[in-house]
Structure formats: C-alpha cells, structure tokens
Swiss-Prot record:
Record's function text: Component of the cytochrome b6-f complex, which mediates electron transfer between photosystem II (PSII) and photosystem I (PSI), cyclic electron flow around PSI, and state transitions. PetL is important for photoautotrophic growth as well as for electron transfer efficiency and stability of the cytochrome b6-f complex.
Gene: petL
Record bears the keyword Membrane: yes
Compartment(s): Plastid, Chloroplast thylakoid membrane
Entry keyword Cell wall biogenesis/degradation: no
UniProt xrefs under InterPro entries: Cyt_b6/f_cplx_su6 (IPR007802)
A Pfam family of this chain: PetL
Subunit structure: The 4 large subunits of the cytochrome b6-f complex are cytochrome b6, subunit IV (17 kDa polypeptide, PetD), cytochrome f and the Rieske protein, while the 4 small subunits are PetG, PetL, PetM and PetN. The complex functions as a dimer.
UniProt-recorded name of the protein: Cytochrome b6-f complex subunit 6
Annotated TM spans: 4-24
Organism: Pelargonium hortorum (Common geranium)
C-alpha cells in the first residue's frame, strides 16, 4: 500500500513540475 501511495505522490509531483515548466515556456514564448 505504501509503494502505491508513494508512486502516485511521485506521479503527482512530476505532473505538477511538467505543467509548471510548460506554462513558463508558454509565457516566455508568448512574450
């Protein structure tokens, strides 16, 4: 159970970082 929770937590963090970088690149590209 702990491995599944940590896996989903890591997936959520990776998704957040990816979306944050994507938004940052989009803003830079927009300017």
């Amino acid at each position: 159970m702990l491995t599944i929770t940590s896996y989903f937590g890591f997936l959520l963090v990776a998704l957040t970082i990816t979306s944050a970088l994507f938004i940052g690149l989009s803003k830079i590209r927009l300017i």
